[in-house]
């Protein structure tokens, strides 16, 4: 288990980085959250055994979606709700990735490009699956976008969880008749055409802002080149169908919150450089085992890579369509009945103590000696002094 944490690196490396790099307000807010989450700065509570056996201090979470140690509760709550709603049918994961030539557009207002990508993927999947040749009915789709690759560079794939069937116009559940829900070459061609059409429509309407170093004529030339499949590929990766959607839903949940790098992937840092693990080819799970690599970056480059993935306020990175959308709430119970499933029973809102217990840890709110629940004896105000971060030598 790694001893170094992202919080350690930020506490010791971010203040100097912030002095020399102008950062947007939402990025500075994220950095402060990563540094202060579950420390005395945010206040906390003292809990003690009624019989005086032990007492514990629990500091408050920052609840920022880019913080890897404070986002787990929101992830587990979302995942519990989705598990309760999943249909008892096969599911497929589809990963759609824009060409690298479009990456500069992400440097401008991120919400605009995010909306355009979701629109493109929605139109691609719903149009394709509406064809009787492939399904002929709207399925349930949950899509999640994250903007990073394994080495923390800009790589914005959109992951979609698609049900292996859909809801027909005459009110019947229709299952996929063959193994491939989305045919690869057809999906790539439609993805390319839909994406280029969306870009050409958005730019004249000022719904898309070009970078300063990309002239309009150069942008149009780039779009023309992106329309040739021999020159540029619009990747559509289809993973093997799963008999249920729990595994893919869990993967989507992990990418929703917590930022691009979780603490277990950190290897070491010495105050000047950070070393972390990455998977060479994560989309090929069977081949990826044993292909774990390590990369070392200067602290400035590392912080820049992490912070570039902080989404601006209001950016929605998870969306639902078809049977998974709220507008089809009336159809979902009928589908469950036809699939011999009971009605949806939403879970009780999870608290962090329950989540810790579900992970197999000792229940944090129970006294390890007598088993009684700990009671709150003191509230610690915000603004306390956080303990110093681990030194680089100790963290390594």
Task: Specify the residue positions occupied by each region the protein language model found.
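Beta->alpha loop/short-helix hinge microenvironment recognizer with preference
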Residues: 1-396
